[in-house]
Amino acid sequence: MEMQWRRLRERLASEQCQDDSVEIDKNECQFFYRLWRCLNDPHAGQADRLHGYYDALQCAHAHGLLPLRLPLKELISTPELARAGLCRNRDYPGEILLDEKALQIAPDLLSVWRNDKRRMLQAPPLDNLLPTLLHDVKYTHYTSVGQQLAVRTVLTSQKDRFLFINLPTGAGKTFIIHSLMLAASPGQLTLVIVPTISLAIEQAHRAQEVFQQAGVDHGGEYAWHSGQSAEERNALKERIKAGEQRLLFCSPEAASSGSLLLLLFSLAKRKLIEALVVDEAHLIDQWGAEFRPEFQLLAPLVKSLVEVAQASIRTVLLSATWSQSTLNTLKELFAGDCPQAIVEVNGSFLRPEPMWYVHKAKDKNDYQLQVEAAIQTLPRPLILYVTTVEDALSWHQYLRTSGYQRSGLIHGKTSPKQRAKQIADWADDNLDIMVATSAFGVGMDKNNVRSVLHVAVPENIDRLYQESGRGGRDGFASVAQIIYRPDQIALARRLNRDNLIGAKKGFLRWQKMHLNRESEGKGRFSVYLATKHDSIKIDSRANIAWNWRTLLLLQRAGFLSLHFSAPDLEQFASNQQSEDAVDRYFNHYFSHIQIELHRDGHLDKQVWNGTLRQLRSQELQTRQKGFLVLEEWLNHQDKPLCGMLETFYTLDGYVPELACGGCPGCREKALPPYSPTLGLIAHAISDEEHGRIGRDIRVYYPSARSSALLLRQWNDWIARLLVNRDIHAIRASQTVLAQLSQQLFKGVPFWCALSPEDATTRWDELVIVMPGERLPDLDPFSDIKRIIVAPETLLEQNVRGRLWWESDPRARSLDQFIRSLSSGHHK
């Protein structure tokens, strides 16, 4: 750090300040690096440059670097310097300092400029098979116990499972996707649906780097998006048809487009879809019924693909911020008719990076002054969140006129082209401030955001936490601040109540859709999603969205389930149809939804006024809960936010690991930031049944040969156990695990690598004891199946003179066991 500071001072004092060749190490100090970028950016404004000096000086202040001043040759007035928290040095007029007020800034804020590490995770070693697949020396450990459990659970689960994965930002959800693809059978496609096109492209680039290293990259595109040329799209289609694509990222809109959907149903018919993964899955609930109805198509799409395949498709839903209500909704949407297929993996912990600050303005003038002061002092990069498009435009205009030219703008009406440019500039550190509505930041892999400023009240605590969590993704301290006016509370309350269908209007919509239904056979009928009841005269997306909300309410109440019919693949078999013709077909296809009724009463007004009104009331209370928690915190800041978040994000009784970067309630109690080692606890929850206690199978072998030779001879039967899914884990010494990962043939299913001292897991396991080793201490009350293979002459522990297998009448020799594998009598 001292060398970087000295180098920065020397370059600023030299005549060649505008020099891109000068190395200021971004990884060592992002604040020095940003100042240098600003000074070499012809588009930067004066406020950008001055704040660059401010951040660099605060960083030096936090690290105790001397001299605490920087050369500034530009002639800038004293008032302008003062607005930036700076002043001229009386003894060295060509240099500037932090002014007295800036030096007296809250000490805990210095942790951001000091780059204090806040996130420390327990990182267990990778299972031995994964490094063999990855061929990358930098992958040696999981990021957390939660990631380890998630990868193991996903890769060993049955294909008919719906897996809900809850891992915090930075705990490695993306690695689950890469592992799933690498461990998949040849020819199988893993489809990953992400919220935005830009994220699909970004994730595809990251995946390609992994696959290049693993030696399985086909050299083409891994994302399906509208920006592709006809040549790129055709090549992608051919790889998908040939079973060579293996992994594909797309947005919900792309998954719902005719061209891709046709390919997906064709693959399903050939049983070539390995898994469907939804990243940021909480948005299905939060966005799907509002401005992105395509999210709500994903659940019926999965059901339809499974029907066409007449085989299971593993479905994985990933999120860092599940709330209980969202989790319950998605369980119902995806697995409402088969709850026994649900598997949850919860490796949640509270984010330790954000330091929370709240300021309630007295009036509009005070509000404006407080926001301006925050913009002038908060570390960069900074996201400034608003609620409305109008506010976004207003604050962006303020920044530009104030000299902050390195500021971007993204809201719900931003064009795709402009959005892509803004995101690229943001990712490349060409912007220091991003003004945004809630549509920005989802899944964005920008790790070094240091401040998130809310200048409006979000509609609930969940949104505040999600958006504030876009700071500090690199694990270092960040600032999360909210400045609000009293009148903004009412707007947040109204936003929180929007988009829930009422019983009266819902009944009218359903009555009209049902009246115009068309029979589809097999006990199903279809309804037109743009149906208008008598009070509606104009076609609109809003009308379709409200019809969706009506159908989803009926589904959540158990009256019906939603399905898409399989498209007529024969119609497109000749491959002569143009893409426009395909899209026209699917525009009509997606304007209808198939319905299967499960109970009576759906046309009874009394049922709507009773059962459905009660359900809607319960859902409204659930939705209001998030707002009420936020409102309570804003009104009672003496209550620790960390404790409130711990309660709010408790899922099915499992509490997230506690951490706190600093909140008003903890500061009032003089409590320092609480950043323990996290990622120590994870839970997998399912209805999967194991057999009775005591299912150990003891297998003994003669130990006359070397361990290496024995393992080579055993290769076939061990592989057979894995392929038949008789076991999902192997417990042995590291030497044995390493040799097995190298010698087992490619295509063998993933297996968990357990050392002898590891605790008992949820997976049936093979225990291998080589000559000269002792039996591990195994839990005798575990309900998993264990096949224990050990030398014939090994003595029972704590029982003098008795061989380890003699007390078990079911014990058998290895030769007998291998013969039983063919007959199936080994179980």
How would you label these PLM feature ranges?
Residues 193, 301, 318, 455, ...:
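Generic beta-sheet signal
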Residues 641, 673-740:
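Long, charge-rich boundary regions
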Residues 1-351, 363-380, 389, 393-406, ...:
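N-terminal helicase ATP-binding lobe
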Residues 436-438, 750-761:
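Short acidic low-complexity segments
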Residues 786, 791, 800-802:
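C-terminal EAL-domain catalytic cores of bacterial cyclic di-GMP phosphodiesterases
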Residues 374-393, 397-412, 418-438, 444-685, ...:
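C-terminal helicase lobe
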